[in-house]
């Protein structure tokens, strides 16, 4: 590598404008970073952070789930909790939609995903570390809470099933043949069990920083190589269409990218970290900041995948794209470290997903979790259900794809419930509720339209699906306005 190449790699925006390449990508990176400092700060001030208010980590400390931890550790745990396969595999699939994927990753992260993650964590913190179903029940009603408990636990089981096979396959490709995929599936499941039942600071608090380092190395390494390679990525002024067969941009792209822009799964993870925060002011770097970093990871993988598709075509699975990019771009050692980062992301989402499911069931059943036997009692049926889905995905040729699609839709639907619950909270607290109302309306339209049009849904034609999505969104807006006007009447 020449001195000029190194300088260009360290000055990405200089090279973008110098060579008139990757300008859209570079601008998108800058906007994401600015979004944290500008809009993230506004959201924090709007919420009304109280640095003197005691947090659940202090008032409910139990040494297991409610426990004070250093802010940097909480950030790393939150980042790894939410950064599963979504910002990597989802971004790779989303790259087939062209520069539209950049727009959704950037603006979806800043105005929807990061707001969703931050406020779900802070509302939980203000409610003594309440889980997502409890928050939804308080602000949307007890009937909705019951639906949310079932829906959330289902999503957690899907997360575990989805986030086992792919990392097991990647590890098997790096180890002796006698250590096959099934061996690593058992190892990962065993790790899930240990991480789910032990106190959060014993395994998760110690292992996650190492995993986080690998994931950060992967993202930074690929970013540097992108600016060295200078691929001719599509620019926004060339149009937002795509030459690949990926389906209609709306709603398919908004479901495919999933965690790279907004994810309901994150709202199940934010309360876990809300139970460990020492001060409310740490909420912005932990919740909003982790989502912005995930958006950056998704943007990097979307750009890398675009460069890959231009050179090799799209007839590859997301796992194959990851394996090729890591090994070809970063060399043997760098590729191994990068793949370890990719492996760490889904595994660390899977264990905290199971932990979330355990805590949600414990809250519902009012079962204390200080004894290991009671933790095991709740974990057993969850692991059995996940194992059943995993077996289905292995035995069925399209099993993983089917489970992934249902996971993606359930994931985004969960974000809709979360955004509506937070909107109600903001109205009751007399704060700017439009910051969540607008994303709530948009995502309501997305998930409704998707389930109408998708192969795993009702398989309706596009026009009818758009009409139904629009009608459902207007109905949601009407019900919200009616409820809000009812508050004024009571007052």
Language model segments and positions:
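Membrane-interface "cap" regions at the ends of multi-pass membrane proteins
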Residues: 19, 31-88, 252, 282
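Extracellular loop-to-transmembrane helix junctions
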Residues: 22-40, 94-124, 133, 334-335, ...
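Membrane-interface loop-to-helix entry segments
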Residues: 26, 30-50, 141, 151, ...
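Helix-loop-helix module between adjacent transmembrane segments
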Residues: 32, 36, 112-128, 132-197, ...
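Flexible loop linkers connecting adjacent transmembrane helices
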Residues: 41-67, 90-93, 107, 115-144, ...
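Hydrophobic, membrane-embedded alpha-helices of multi-pass small-molecule transporters
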Residues: 69-86, 223-231, 239-301, 340-349
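Hydrophobic alpha-helical segments and their helix-loop junctions in multi-pass secondary transporters
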Residues: 160-184, 195-196, 215-241, 425-433, ...
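Extracellular/periplasmic helix-exit of transmembrane alpha-helices
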Residues: 226-236, 288-324, 394-395
């Amino acid at each position: 590598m020449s001195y000029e190449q190194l300088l260009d790699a360290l000055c990405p925006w200089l090279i973008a404008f110098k060579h008139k390449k990757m300008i859209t990508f570079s601008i998108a990176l800058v906007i994401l970073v600015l979004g944290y400092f500008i809009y993230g700060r506004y959201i924090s001030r709007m919420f009304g952070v109280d640095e003197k208010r005691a947090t659940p980590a202090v008032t409910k400390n139990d040494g297991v789930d409610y426990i004070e931890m250093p802010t940097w550790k909480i950030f790393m745990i939150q980042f790894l909790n939410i950064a599963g396969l979504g910002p990597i595999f989802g971004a790779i699939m989303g790259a087939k939609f062209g520069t539209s994927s950049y727009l959704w990753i950037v603006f979806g992260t800043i105005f929807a995903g990061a707001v969703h993650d931050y406020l779900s964590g802070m509302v939980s913190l203000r409610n003594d570390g309440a889980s997502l179903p409890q928050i939804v029940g308080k602000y949307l009603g007890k009937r909705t809470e019951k639906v949310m408990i079932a829906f959330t636990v289902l999503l957690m089981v899907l997360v575990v099933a989805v986030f086992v096979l792919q990392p097991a396959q990647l590890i098997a490709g790096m180890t002796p043949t006698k250590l096959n995929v099934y061996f690593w599936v058992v190892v990962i499941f065993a790790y899930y069990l240990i991480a789910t039942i032990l106190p959060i600071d014993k395994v998760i608090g110690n292992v996650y920083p190492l995993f986080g380092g690998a994931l950060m190395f992967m993202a930074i390494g690929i970013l540097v190589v992108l600016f060295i390679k200078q691929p001719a990525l599509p620019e926004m002024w060339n149009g937002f269409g795509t030459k690949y067969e990926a389906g209609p941009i709306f709603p398919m792209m908004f479901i495919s990218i999933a965690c790279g822009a907004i994810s309901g799964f994150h709202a199940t993870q934010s309360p876990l970290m809300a139970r460990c925060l020492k001060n409310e002011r740490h909420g912005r770097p932990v919740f909003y900041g982790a989502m912005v970093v995930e958006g950056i990871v998704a943007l990097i993988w979307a750009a890398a995948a675009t460069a890959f598709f231009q050179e090799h075509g799209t007839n590859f699975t997301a796992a194959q794209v990851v394996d090729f990019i890591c090994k070809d771009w970063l060399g043997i050692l760098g590729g191994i470290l990068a793949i370890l980062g990719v492996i760490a992301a889904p595994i660390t989402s899977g264990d905290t997903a199971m932990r979330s499911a355990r805590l949600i069931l414990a809250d519902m059943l009012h079962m204390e979790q200080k004894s290991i036997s009671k933790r095991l009692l709740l974990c057993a049926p969850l692991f059995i259900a996940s194992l059943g889905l995993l077996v289905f995905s292995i035995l069925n040729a399209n099993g993983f794809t089917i489970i992934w699609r249902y996971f993606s839709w359930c994931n985004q639907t969960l974000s809709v419930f979360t955004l509506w619950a937070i909107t109600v909270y903001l109205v009751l607290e007399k704060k700017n509720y439009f910051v969540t109302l607008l994303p709530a309306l948009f995502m309501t339209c997305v998930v409704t339209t998707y389930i109408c049009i998708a192969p795993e849904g009702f398989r309706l034609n596009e026009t009818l699906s758009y009409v139904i999505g629009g009608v459902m969104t207007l109905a949601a807006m009407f019900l919200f306005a009616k409820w809000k006007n009812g508050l004024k009447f009571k007052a």
